[in-house]
Regions:
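Short glycine-rich anion-binding loops that position phosphate/pyrophosphate groups of nucleotides
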Residues: 9-11, 73-76, 99-101
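Short, glycine-/small-residue-rich phosphate/pyrophosphate-handling segment
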Residues: 44-45, 94, 103-138
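Short beta->alpha junction loops
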Residues: 44-52
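Short Gly/Thr/Asp-enriched flexible loops that form oxyanion-binding sites at enzyme active sites
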Residues: 79-88
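Short acidic/histidine-rich motifs immediately flanking catalytic phosphotransfer sites
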Residues: 61-68
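Short acidic active-site motifs
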Residues: 53-57
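Extreme N-terminal starter segment of soluble prokaryotic enzymes
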Residues: 1-4
Length: 138
């Protein structure tokens, strides 16, 4: 099974940024553990702070992969274009957020992605990525 993990802006700073909200583990460390646990799956990873690069990656994998795990970061609440890109592809997407976006500031409760995703995992920390993989391989 081919699964793409796509992370949006500032997720490259996990482990350094707001550790009280996002935890102290870097995504690279977490990804290594994830790839080891799911060694029978092909897991690709992409991160960008640039909206257009995220859209390009969604389009690149969106017709050939079995699943996309997508954390759009701050673009969740602002990018109609990312929502449109997800609507345009055939690969199912699970939207993942490390923090509970529905329990934070009011502006974070809007997602331009959720309505196009097959599901949303929010507030379960990095475990949300693992749960998304479990969904795809079930």
């Amino acid at each position: 099974m081919k699964i793409a993990i796509i992370n949006g802006p500032n997720l490259n700073l996990l482990g350094k940024r707001e550790v009280d909200i996002y935890g102290g583990e870097s995504f690279d460390t977490f990804l290594s553990k994830l790839k080891e646990k799911y060694a029978n799956q092909e897991i690709a990873y992409f991160q960008s702070n640039v909206e257009g690069e995220l859209i390009n990656e969604i389009q690149r994998v969106g017709f050939s992969y079995d699943g996309i795990i997508f954390n759009p970061g701050g673009y969740t609440h602002t990018s109609v274009a990312i929502g449109d890109a997800i609507a345009a592809i055939t690969t199912p997407v699970i939207e993942v957020h490390i923090s509970n976006i529905f329990g934070r500031e009011e502006f974070r409760k809007l997602s331009h992605v959720s309505g196009k995703a097959v599901g949303v995992i929010s507030g379960l920390g990095l475990k949300g990525y693992e749960l998304a993989i479990e969904y795809f391989i079930a």
